[in-house]
Amino acid sequence: MVFSTTAALSLLLALSSMQLSEVSEACTCMPNHPQEAFCNSDIVIRAKVVGKKLLKDGPFGTMRYTIKQMKMYRGFSKMQQVQYIYTEAAESLCGVRLQVNKFQYLITGRVFDGEVYTGVCNFIVPWDRLTLSQRKGLNHRYQYGCNCKIKPCYYLPCFVTAKNECFWTDMLSDQGYMGHQAKHYVCIRQKEGYCSWYRGAAPPDKTRINATDP
């Protein structure tokens, strides 16, 4: 009986340890180019956080941020105005921490049951850290490229498997995934039907796009 109790306690501790490990390591995000973050989001807004409230405590709690929306870039079909942003309270579950009354943020998220949810795997960054190219991308360029696919390249050589793909090679540089392509380029379909990187001062038109490989 003593052996059984000891074994049961050991098993319980082991399972508890595994569960805690799973929770602490649950938040793993694949890098996203800002264009894909834009295209894969239901909502993309520029906003300032003006308040926060913990709705549910504990490891599976929810944090609600009250925001002042400055501009919406994507999501008009879902809602016209966003007042609250929801995220997991625990950082281990990909909850994001936003500063109140400090920054304007670019916030991307998904809509569930009429509410906007976001987390560290979404593209969230203080507005003043965005490059001019990224800001232009939000206004029109990223939308033009939503029918293209940005394919991360971690090791050379990389191979295109479809004509709608652009290689994302920032991970091969010292800057990592927020390198030159993420900061300055958008992947756009050309009139010939294939996608390639674009960078320019003027918005790309739909009939002729000057593509530039970074």
Swiss-Prot record:
What are the glycosylated positions?
210
Q: Which GO terms describe its cellular component?
A: extracellular matrix; extracellular space
- Where is region (Involved in metalloproteinase-binding) located? 27-30, 91-92
Q: Which SMART domains does the record cross-reference, listed alphabetically?
A: NTR
What are the cysteine partners in each disulfide bond? 27-94, 29-121, 39-146, 148-195, 153-158, 166-187
- Where is the site described as Involved in metalloproteinase-binding found in this chain? 40
Tissue specificity comment: Expressed abundantly in brain and cartilage.
What is a GO molecular function of this protein? protease binding
Q: Where in the cell is it found?
A: Secreted, Extracellular space, Extracellular matrix
Which Pfam families does the entry link to?
Answer: TIMP
Is DNA repair set as a keyword in this record?
Answer: no
**Which PANTHER family has this protein been placed in?**
METALLOPROTEASE INHIBITOR, METALLOPROTEINASE INHIBITOR 3
Name used for this protein in its record: Metalloproteinase inhibitor 3
Q: Which organism is it from?
A: Scyliorhinus torazame
| Organism lineage string | Eukaryota, Metazoa, Chordata, Craniata, Vertebrata
